[in-house]
């Protein structure tokens, strides 16, 4: 069955476009019914980021959940990993995060977590999808069995203590000047406070949300302001989170960006040296740079690749027993601590290494030189361009040219009629020629089918 609502990270779209109060109400009802297992009083934890539309969606979800007899615990603006943690810690049946992650304020979304804090499986999402398109009137709770809603105080302190406990008790960040960019998003209160409690000299930007400025020229997808601030303040490190704080990038003392691949390299190598890797491997997606794979191989660490999406990374980690994984975009999953990506916890592990080694971030975090990588998109109207003989031939020729010196990844988008062509290798010019050849072939095939 094709999925109409759920993508790779919950339901996401334009507020009052796809994401309407009516849809949120129905999601609350359907998810509430799907997770009413057992005879106990059922409850759901709901958090959100700082988008203007969060109020509208939150109220609609509350109406949906309470109408099927589920109690609602509202925690307000909180990082996605905090909502996952609270779902488990508060013995809830379900967790919900209202966020469109790194998107701008016009979009919003609904992420769902099971009782142990993990994102839902495809099968459970399909079960909920089926209910979204049917009438649930006959399944609503009786008047005396309706749910209640209440706001929970003190949740910021719970997450701060959780994050601090991922570091050794004796470790302090005293002496480190840290610039934190919270993307005007969900972490704007809790993360600067946690860094201060750990002893860092904290300079905060992206901590003045107004409902409209989440991820706007700030955060992990737009680190230019952070890079400039680190240089201006002569800071030791910059940390950039996205709107819901499940991804992170760092900036070294020179103002240079450290992406998710470099973070996987430094954490993977460090944890192997300390005997903390559950198995000699790290899980990443097909988009991670070949330079990461080569670096890890030199350290005796395998790189396992999954489809794009942090949920697939986590599935592989749980299936095969790995405890470090992530994406080049900055979703870092450390399953010793988290059930989902946690940008702040990942950053703390690197800060701990910087303190332990007494070396600048530029030396600690730049473990390999990324190979040149070129990504191009080809839009098409109809047909199956990847089945065209000219395209197949161009791909085969490209693979021969890159054999042993690079790789190709050609995949259709899951959300729009676009073919994504990615090539990387030791020689930039060769990679560009290979990618352009495939793009030209795809363009010809798309034009012929139009």
Curated annotation (Swiss-Prot):
GO cellular component, one term: cytosol
Record note on modification: Activated by phosphorylation.
Sites of Phosphoserine modification: 101
GO biological process: carbohydrate metabolic process; peptidoglycan biosynthetic process; UDP-N-acetylglucosamine biosynthetic process
EC numbers: 5.4.2.10
CDD domains found in the cross-reference section: GlmM (cd05802)
KW Phosphoprotein (keyword) present: yes
Keywords per UniProt: Isomerase, Magnesium, Metal-binding, Phosphoprotein
Gene Ontology molecular-function annotations: magnesium ion binding; phosphoglucosamine mutase activity; phosphomannomutase activity
Cofactors named for this entry: Mg(2+)
Catalytic activity: alpha-D-glucosamine 1-phosphate = D-glucosamine 6-phosphate
List of residues binding Mg(2+): 101, 242, 244, 246
Isomerase is among the record's keywords: yes
The organism's place on the tree of life at top rank: Bacteria
Active site per database record: 101
Pfam families: PGM_PMM_I (PF02878), PGM_PMM_II (PF02879), PGM_PMM_III (PF02880), PGM_PMM_IV (PF00408)
HAMAP family linked to this entry: GlmM_B
Known role: Catalyzes the conversion of glucosamine-6-phosphate to glucosamine-1-phosphate.
Family under the similarity heading: Belongs to the phosphohexose mutase family.
Designated name of the protein: Phosphoglucosamine mutase
Source organism per UniProt: Rhodopseudomonas palustris (strain ATCC BAA-98 / CGA009)
